[in-house]
């Protein structure tokens, strides 16, 4: 994408749609480059020259790391014994690995797709372990998802057994709950990749009642998470309409304050409360 002149348009698409806050985006910002005005070929050349040292280092790295117990690879492998005999794209772009699986006797550790993509009704970015398929997914969505975390998978081997632990970093501000707020338990609805297009059925001051076009799911979406593009409405990113019960003196992480409501994380439970129940620590 950076080194191949024929892929200069792909790099432009990456910057506009995917690569927010990555090193390519940082160069564009530092050089004050305008994506709308710069020719793709010139843009690609500037980025390539600015990141030559980093690109050389990345090019020197192996595509996979293999031990007796594990294979570490970016996106996945083909479901065959000679998985090495496959296009590079299958290692770095494979989207169906968790579904199709592999035939190795060892664990395959992958990233690429954020783990939150695999949950239908909740936003959850933890390390995902499928012991039956021997697949461990560690991508917490950092740099891609609005709500994300940086995961670390810790593997301990005492010579007889493997032990898995995980740790994560999620630098969000902490607030304290001022008083109890009970919310009736209802079914939660989630908007997630790749189905972000919506139809607004009813708009109110804080939330709009919407239908997800490709799933026909109905839910209330905070107005700040709705945007218009080419005469179509979309949800900004992964979103959940869940409201959370909170108790006095509990500490919660705040994703954001939006009007009269706050998007919070309480013990890894993600959802909404009225912002009046919060005080900053």
Please tell me what each predicted stretch does.
Residues 1-62:
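Active-site neighborhood of divalent metal-dependent phosphoester bond hydrolases
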Residues 85-93, 120-132:
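Short, surface-exposed loop/helix-turn segments at secondary-structure junctions
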Residues 131-180, 184:
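Binuclear metal-dependent phosphoesterase catalytic core
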Residues 191-221, 245-281:
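SH3/SH3-like beta-barrel superfamily modules
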Residues 172-193, 197, 204-206, 214-217, ...:
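Beta-loop motif signature
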Residues 1, 72-73, 106-116, 137-141:
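Active-site neighborhood of phospho(di)ester-bond hydrolases with catalytic His/Asp-centered motifs
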Residues 76-100:
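Active-site-proximal segments of metal-dependent phosphoesterases and phosphodiesterases across multiple
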Residues 65-71:
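Beta-strand-turn-beta hairpins that frame and shape the catalytic cleft
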């Amino acid at each position: 994408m950076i080194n191949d002149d024929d892929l200069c348009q792909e790099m432009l698409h990456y910057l506009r749609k995917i690569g927010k806050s990555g090193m390519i985006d940082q160069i564009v910002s530092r050089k004050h480059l305008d994506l709308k005005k710069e020719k793709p070929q010139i843009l690609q050349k500037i980025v390539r020259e600015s990141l030559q040292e980093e690109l050389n280092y990345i090019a020197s790295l192996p595509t996979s790391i293999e031990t007796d117990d594990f294979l570490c690879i970016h996106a996945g492998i083909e479901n065959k014994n000679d998985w090495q005999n496959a296009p590079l794209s299958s290692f770095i772009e494979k989207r169906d690995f968790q579904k199709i699986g592999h035939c190795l006797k060892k664990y395959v550790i992958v990233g690429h797709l954020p783990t939150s993509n695999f949950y239908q009704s909740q936003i959850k970015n933890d390390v995902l372990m499928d012991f039956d398929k021997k697949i461990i997914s560690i991508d917490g969505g950092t740099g891609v998802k609005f709500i994300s975390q940086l995961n670390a998978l810790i593997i301990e081997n005492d010579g007889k057994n493997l032990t898995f632990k995980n740790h994560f970093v999620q630098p969000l501000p902490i607030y304290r709950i001022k008083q109890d707020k009970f919310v009736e338990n209802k079914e939660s609805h989630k908007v997630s990749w790749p189905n972000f297009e919506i139809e607004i059925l009813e708009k109110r001051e804080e939330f709009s009642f919407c239908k997800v076009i490709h799933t026909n799911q109905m839910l209330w979406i905070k107005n700040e998470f709705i945007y218009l593009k080419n005469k179509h409405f979309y949800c900004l990113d992964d979103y959940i309409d869940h409201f959370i019960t909170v108790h006095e003196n509990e500490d919660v992480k705040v994703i954001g304050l939006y009007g009269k409501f706050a998007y919070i994380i309480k013990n890894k439970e993600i959802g909404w409360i009225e912002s009046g129940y919060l005080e900053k620590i």
